[in-house]
Each structure stands twice: as C-alpha cells, then as structure tokens.
UniProtKB/Swiss-Prot annotation:
The keyword NADP does not apply. GO terms for biological process: proteolysis. The keyword Cytoplasm does not apply. One of its GO terms (molecular function) is serine-type carboxypeptidase activity. Transmembrane segments: none annotated. The lineage of its organism: Eukaryota, Fungi, Dikarya, Ascomycota, Pezizomycotina. It is found in: Vacuole. This is Carboxypeptidase Y homolog A.
C-alpha cells in the first residue's frame, strides 16, 4: 500500500505535494484568533509581492492544482486543562532569574544570565518510575510556559543509567516539522519501546545508558505540547528552546555542569543549527553546550535535492526503486528545482521558498513515494500505516492512556504522534527550503558538529548529507574534504557498522543498513556512535 498523499514524513521531510497553498477569498473572518497568525504574515507578504514572484507562484499552482486546493492555512488550538500549581513539585520563573545581577571583570553590572526570560516559567514533577515502568532511573516531566504567548512545551527527562553526576546531558528532537519527540523516546533511543499490546519493553541500547536525556515536544501543539497560538518557523522556536534549557538547568543545577549536547533527526537539520546558534549567542548562560548531532537531516536543500535521483536509481548502495524512464524524468526536473531553490536562498522570501518546496518535493520525492516503497527505508515497502510504521499507532495508543497522562502531568486531551497542520504552517512560512546550513560555519568555530546518516534512508539520504558537508564553505573546508572515509567499528568485537570522516570540528558518518531512524534500525551502532562522540572520539585527533 503506497504512502498516503496526506502523509507527514516522520522526523522530517514531508513530501509536500499535498501541502500546497492557495490564496484565500478573505482574511477578515480568520484573523479573530491568535492561532491564525501565519495568515496575517501571509497577508503582509502579499503587499510586497513582485510580478516575477507572483508569476512563479502561479506557474507552480498551474502545475500542481490539486495540491493547492488541498492547502490548509491554520491549525486549531489543542483542547487542554491546565493543572493547579500545587500539583507540581517545582516551579521556577524566568523573571526571578532575570532579577539577579552580578558585577563583571570591568566592575560593571550585568545580568547573571542573558536572554529575554521574564515571560517564561518552568513546571516540573517527579515521575515515579514504578508507576509506568519505562525505566528505573530518576525522571522529571513538565512544561515550559510562555505566559505572554500562551505556549506550553512538554518535556520528559531521564537520568543516566550509569553515572548521572558526571555523565553528559543530551536533548533529543524529532522533526516533521510537527512530530513528537516521544516517538523517538519509545521507538528509537529511549529507555523502553511500546509493544503491539501497549506493554513496556526494556531497551538495552537506550541513549541514557551513559547520558541523561531530555525529550522535548516542540514546536507548540506537537505531542503533549499546546498553545492558543502557533509557531511556524524555526527561528521563532529557537527562543523557546533557550528559555527551556536555561530554566531547567537553573531548577536542576546538578545537571548544569556536565557537558550538554543537542541531537535530533530529519527536520532537526533545520532546528539544531538555529537552536545551537541561539544558545551560543548568549555570553552569560548556564547551558554548557559542547556539541551537536544531526541524523539524516534536511539542512541544505540545494545540495541535498540533487541526490534524490541517484538514491532512487541504485547509486546509493541499494537496488534501484525507479526505472530508467523515471530516473530520466528526475534528471530533467532537477535544473528547474535547483533554480527555484537558488531563488529561495537569495531572497529567503515566502514567495520564493514555498514554490521551491512545492515543485521540488513533487518532482524529486513524488516519483519515489508513488511506488509505495518506504521513503524512510529503500529496502522495504511502506505497509499499511500511512507513516509506514505500525509502532507509531502503538505509541499513540499508549500515550493516550489516562494513567500515562496523569503520571507525566500531560495537560492536553489527546496525544498525536504527528501534527499535520504544524507541517503546513512551516511550509506556509517558507521555512522548509531556507538555507539553514549557513549557520553551521559559525557553530563550527565554537563546538564540534556531527552529521550522521543511515544509508538506507531515501528522504534525507546519506548521499545528500555527505555532499552538503563537503559543499559547505568554512575555514576548515579544504582539510575536511581531503579527509578519507574510514571504517567505523564497534569497540570490542571489531564489527564494521559504518564509515566516518572527520577534520577539525566537523564529522560525517555513514551507518550501514540504517534507515531514516538509525537508532530504530541499528540500536547497537547508534549507541556506539553516541558514546564515542560524547567521549570526544572523533574530533580530538
């Protein structure tokens, strides 16, 4: 059964042929509610639309009329019931942090911690490990609250199974945009998975084996998170992440001195560069950011989209999915795709970036998707679930149990693994195709960056990820490009599980027989990668 045309691709790149926009007849009826803010932004953009941009928009609309007709401009807020403050074990307010001033080396007064935090607060509760049985370690869950914008981000923290007083802390982000990081928790790298009958199954390769891990549902209205408004671009989400981490480490200072790392997959290839840059921009911070890890990410569309045809046509190490005529059609379509992406890169305008996303996803992802083959794993068909994995239904069922929601303090009325409307809102803002790779050189000046990719993924394939790291302009580019791919082996048994190249602060890793979600397909290899990376095994040389 082929992927549903309305499918949102897990963790990141959604094939957008169904999520295209048309002009509304009237904005006036829709602008009463704050959650229609993307519409207001669109109306403002209309005022500055050039004739050339409008012509491009209309051209793409004519090519894919059905897609435009199925457009959705907004998402409704999630039903929720906020708990009394007395039901939480800890509450910390950003205003209290902002009120602390210190004297710097020059004798000048400055805030102890930078950033605009007054509007934020953090609620936390201890999760009794014996109630759910997900893991035996210390756990906290709760919400970051933005009281001004009425945004509430849910998180779930698991302490390291090994040495939590000294082990690193890792933030994990799924992509979408619009997919819950709790799917990563229970399907990929968390302490347990969910079985078909919604039972807990211990994961011996959990990433909290040697690190404490925070799973965050973001942006708002994803998973257990909620809001009466909306976040529809990556940069806006970055401010929330900085606030969350600042308040979390202030409330739990026992974790603030260890090294901190941001990790994620797919659309996190957009998120992580921006989030890391936001954190590093603050001189006075309590976030000890030491590295970032991006798995099968979408970061540089101009480079990565060129490699859809090779991956689909047997040049990525796996048999071809498409026939010769389909491959030729993709070859013919790419120059137009590249031209549209270049226009997006040059202007970063919604009117350039949205058509680029629409055309390129239809031309470069659509032919593969229509075969019914799994876009996350070229080795297998998609199956009956519209997102190709039955586990997502099992996880959704488990996280909708009343006893589970009560145990973690969830305030929404229902949990969904992925919110399709969030995906469309990000597309509406032109976020999909923007050049977030341009942020990476500034990050490389300060901390190491790992780009890893399972080599059986199609949607954010290893060919494209390797290519964009080699196309990136940064001071260490020459040495990085001259570095050779070497075998990556499991310590102890010497089994080769991938290849890696590294120079300076930049590392790329190809993991054999892993799909879009490497920890799901290759749990042992993914944990080996994480442990080696956190230990500095790739960049110290």
């Amino acid at each position: 059964m082929k992927v549903a045309t309305s499918a949102l691709l897990i963790g990141a790149a959604a094939a957008q042929q169904q999520q295209i926009l048309k002009f509304p007849d009237s904005f006036s009826e829709l602008k009463e509610s704050s959650w229609t803010k993307p519409l207001q932004n669109l109306e403002e953009s209309l005022k500055s639309l050039t004739g050339e941009a409008r012509a491009t928009w209309d051209e793409i609309a004519m090519m894919f009329p059905e897609s435009f007709e199925k457009a959705a401009f907004f998402s409704e807020p999630k039903p929720h019931t906020r708990k009394q403050d007395s039901e939480w074990d800890h509450i910390i307010k950003g205003a209290d942090i902002q009120s602390v001033w210190v004297e710097n080396e020059k004798g000048e007064k400055e805030r102890e911690i930078d950033g605009k935090l007054e509007q934020y607060s953090l609620r936390a509760k201890k999760v009794d490990p014996s109630v759910l049985g997900v893991d035996k370690v210390k756990q906290y869950s709760g919400y970051l609250d933005d009281e001004e914008e009425d945004k509430h981000l849910f998180y779930w923290f698991f302490e390291s199974r090994n040495d939590p007083k000294n082990d690193p802390v890792v933030l994990w982000l799924n992509g979408g945009p619009g997919c819950s990081s709790l799917t990563g928790l229970f399907m990929e790298l968390g302490p347990a998975s969910i079985t078909k009958d919604q039972k807990i199954k211990h994961n011996p390769y959990s990433w909290n084996s040697n690190a404490s891990v925070i799973f965050l549902d973001q942006p708002v209205n994803v998973g257990y998170s909620y809001s009466s408004g909306s976040v529809s671009n990556t940069v806006a989400a970055g401010k929330d992440i900085y606030a969350l981490l600042t308040l979390f480490f202030k409330q739990f200072p026992e974790y603030s001195h260890q090294s901190f790392h941001i990790s994620g997959e797919s659309y996190a290839g957009h998120y992580i560069p921006v989030f890391a840059s936001e954190i590093l921009s603050h001189k006075n911070r309590n976030i000890n950011l030491q590295s970032v890890l991006i798995g099968n990410g979408l970061t540089d569309g101009l480079t990565q989209y060129e490699y859809y045809r090779p991956m689909a046509c047997g040049e990525g190490g796996w048999p071809a999915v498409l026939d010769e005529s389909q491959c030729k059609a993709m070859d013919n379509a790419y120059p137009r795709c590249a031209s549209l992406i270049e226009n997006c890169y040059n202007s970063e305008s919604v009117w350039s970036c949205v058509p680029a996303s629409i055309y390129c996803n239809n031309a470069m992802i659509g032919p593969y998707q229509r075969t019914g083959q799994n876009v996350y794993d070229v080795r297998k068909p998609c199956g009956s679930n519209s997102l190709c994995y039955d586990e997502l239904d099992w996880i959704q069922g488990y996280l909708n149990k009343k006893e589970v929601m009560k145990a973690v303090g969830a305030e929404v009325s229902n949990y969904e693994s992925c919110n399709f409307d969030i995906n469309r809102n990000f597309l509406l803002q032109g976020d999909w195709m923007k050049p977030f790779h341009r942020v990476v050189p500034g990050i490389l000046e300060k901390i190491p960056v790992l780009i890893y990719a399972g080599d059986a993924d199609y949607i954010c394939n290893w060919l494209g990820n390797k290519a964009w790291t080699e196309a990136l302009e940064w001071p260490g580019a020459k040495a990085y490009n001259q570095a050779k791919m070497e075998d990556f082996k499991i310590d102890g048994d010497g089994k080769t599980v991938g290849q890696v190249k590294s120079s300076g602060n930049f590392t790329f890793m190809r993991l054999h027989a892993g799909g879009h979600m490497v920890p799901y397909d290759q749990p042992e290899a993914s944990l080996e990668m994480l442990n080696r990376w956190l230990g500095g095994g790739f960049w110290k040389a």
